[in-house]
Design a protein with these regions (language model features):
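Short, conserved loop/helix-junction motifs that constitute active-site signature segments
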Residues: 200-204, 229-231
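Short beta-strand/loop motif that positions the catalytic acidic residue
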Residues: 203, 209-211
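Alpha/beta-hydrolase-fold enzymes
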Residues: 63-65, 69-167
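Active-site nucleophile elbow and catalytic-triad environment of alpha/beta-hydrolase enzymes
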Residues: 163-164, 179-199
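Single conserved hydrophobic/aromatic residue that forms the stacking wall/gate
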Residues: 1-3, 236-245
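Acidic catalytic loop of the alpha/beta-hydrolase fold
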Residues: 214-218
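Short alpha-helix in the alpha/beta-hydrolase fold that links the catalytic acid
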Residues: 192-196, 219-229
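Gly/Pro-rich cap/lid or specificity-loop segments adjacent to the active site
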Residues: 4-51, 58, 62-85
């Protein structure tokens, strides 16, 4: 985090305390208290927002009249942790990371952050969508199969990922990215509550769960685990080549 209110007056950087999805929900609940919101008609979210929605259902069921959960499972899977820790490694391996103390040095780990974004963005899109949009075509005006590797151009999908990386670098801090990605790795609604099935089966918040059959990051198996154990639930299956959240 680039907030400059640490005890020593310097940027927090990578020294900022680790946070969890539950920490985020506690902060949201405190904000709701300040705003005078006692109960929500619906709490809705996808991916990290879906993880927070699940925690709202478990932590503050009396404040949630209904919930909508998209693209998330009851806990981070080995596959998801693998995707996400690889993104973190891309950032922390950048020499400009400087052990997370890069703020104010004039050097930021933008290369690592861009690689992390490319990795993440591949997990956000389905194989079918990428093939339909790009296949193995070259980027406009470029030749990716030239004989000289130092001079060759890009494939269309490379150009697309470069664009997504460039957009994120201009608006996001690398320490924030690491902190939030680590929070997703920690996601587990059953931790300290008797296990996933127990906490789901005792939840009384009515919920709609949406599952996309082409989602490579949050597969149907995980979504169906929620559906199998939540007592007040509607499950919606979406067959869609494009992941839209």
């Amino acid at each position: 985090m680039c907030i400059r209110d640490s005890p020593d007056g310097h940027y927090w950087g990578a020294r900022f305390p680790a946070i969890s999805i539950r920490d985020m929900v506690r902060a949201e609940a405190q904000l709701a208290n300040i705003l005078g919101i006692r109960r929500f008609a619906a709490v809705i979210g996808g991916s990290m927002g879906g993880a927070r929605t699940l925690e709202w259902m478990m932590m503050y069921p009396q404040r949630v009249a209904s919930a909508g959960v998209l693209a998330v499972g009851p806990c981070a899977s080995a596959d998801q942790i693998g995707w996400q820790t690889t993104q973190i490694l891309a950032i922390t391996s950048d020499p400009a990371w400087q052990q997370g103390g890069y703020h104010g040095t004039g050097r930021e780990p933008t290369m690592g952050l861009g690689i992390a974004r490319r990795i993440a963005h591949l997990s956000y899109r389905s194989e079918q969508e990428l093939e339909r949009r790009f296949a193995n075509r070259p980027a406009p005006g470029e030749d990716p199969i030239g004989e000289d590797l130092s001079m060759q151009g890009r494939y269309a999908v490379q150009s697309y990922l470069d664009h997504q990386a460039s957009k994120l670098i201009s608006r996001f801090d690398a320490c924030c990215y690491v902190l939030l990605t680590d929070a997703l790795n920690r996601h587990d609604i059953g931790r300290g509550r008797g296990g996933i099935h127990h906490v789901l089966e005792t939840c009384e918040v009515p919920a709609v769960i949406c599952a996309v059959d082409t989602d490579r990051l949050y597969p149907l198996r995980q979504i169906e685990e929620l559906a199998d154990h939540l007592p007040y639930l509607s499950l919606i299956h979406i067959s869609e080549p494009t992941r839209r959240y």
